[in-house]
Amino acid sequence: MVLGKVKSLTISFDCLNDSNVPVYSSGDTVSGRVNLEVTGEIRVKSLKIHARGHAKVRWTESRNAGSNTAYTQNYTEEVEYFNHKDILIGHERDDDNSEEGFNTIHSGRHEYAFSFELPQTPLATSFEGRHGSVRYWVKAELHRPWLLPVKLKKEFTVFEHIDINTPSLLSPQAGTKEKTLYCWFCTSGPISLSAKIERKGYTPGESIQIFAEIENCSSRMVVPKAAIYQTQAFYAKGKMKEVKQLVANLRGESLSSGKTETWNGKLLKIPPVSPSILDCSIIRVEYSLMVYVDIPGAMDLFLNLPLVIGTIPLHPFGSRTSSVSSQCSMNMNWLGLSLPERPEAPPSYAEVVTEEQRRNNLAPGSACDDFERALQGPLFAYIQEFRFLPPPLYSEIDPNPDQPADDRPSCPSR
């Protein structure tokens, strides 16, 4: 008898949302089919599936051991969320010599259903970063006697939902900073910055209304700007590696000496980005809005307001929905939004981060490449174009702390 051949082995998921994207949350049932097409008859020992979800980080650092000796230190850590195995056809036995227990599959197309339940405990949102990832996948393995197994792995996306309607994410965020410029023995007037946003939580596709007042009492021309940053933090063996990425930004009008500019709800749109990851012990993804004043020839004055990017949008008049699948469907809509036009570069990395901080905490290489890689993960596979400039990195340490309110010089009248 001439044995047949395996023409194709594929995996398909039963989607829970209207966008036909396999997206799930903790407690959901993941179901689908392993599709097998053969030409002629084949004998099969087993058809197995293996489903797994895990977060993993890895990076290396060069060390100097003295006497012109260097070595590489590896940092790795992993968290497993679930590990499920099932046999769709056959048995576990690996004996090829026994004819007993083999299954015959006839020529044509065949479907084998599978299902498993995700844990009820919180799961980290799917993510791809420079030094780590959160991945969920199903692997099918077809075992035949005296032949190598046929294997296929397919990823699916998990959202750990963040509801921005919670009180902590609805609270306004505000701050004030001031800076006085010095040039040799001359002291210029201060530059002051106050900014406020209506809440902390947003979803991709929303626009942040920025309320700000910038007063320029210095002798220089300055430019107020705002930018959204993503911060990826990876943890292993008591160490932390950090990557910071520009997401979106805007520019105000140039402000001459003695002038004041007011933003009454200036809009900055959030592009399609990964939700915040706040509950994973080895990977953390956070966002912030930086409102700053670009000062030629001096370190910029900047103010950071924390953001949380969620998955369940703001409900008008307090209306709520309890359907996780409908929330998924609703949130799939913003994933198709177009990316913004190429933003201008924010303040330079050297202006706001010391050399020591850079060596200790920040990763080398282009952070833009990291963000492109994140957007190419299963959650954003359909985003075709990425036009961000390579962003500089920044620190939240303010080298010019606020002066006491009573000591603030007033801008001279003109």
Swiss-Prot record:
Segments of skewed composition (Basic and acidic residues): 405-414
Keyword flag Disulfide bond: no
Membrane topology designation: Peripheral membrane protein
Residues spanned by motif PPxY motif 2: 391-394
Family note: Belongs to the arrestin family.
Role according to the record: Adapter protein that plays a role in regulating cell-surface expression of adrenergic receptors and probably also other G protein-coupled receptors. Plays a role in NEDD4-mediated ubiquitination and endocytosis af activated ADRB2 and subsequent ADRB2 degradation. May recruit NEDD4 to ADRB2. Alternatively, may function as adapter protein that does not play a major role in recruiting NEDD4 to ADRB2, but rather plays a role in a targeting ADRB2 to endosomes.
Record-given protein name: Arrestin domain-containing protein 3
Species of provenance: Bos taurus (Bovine)
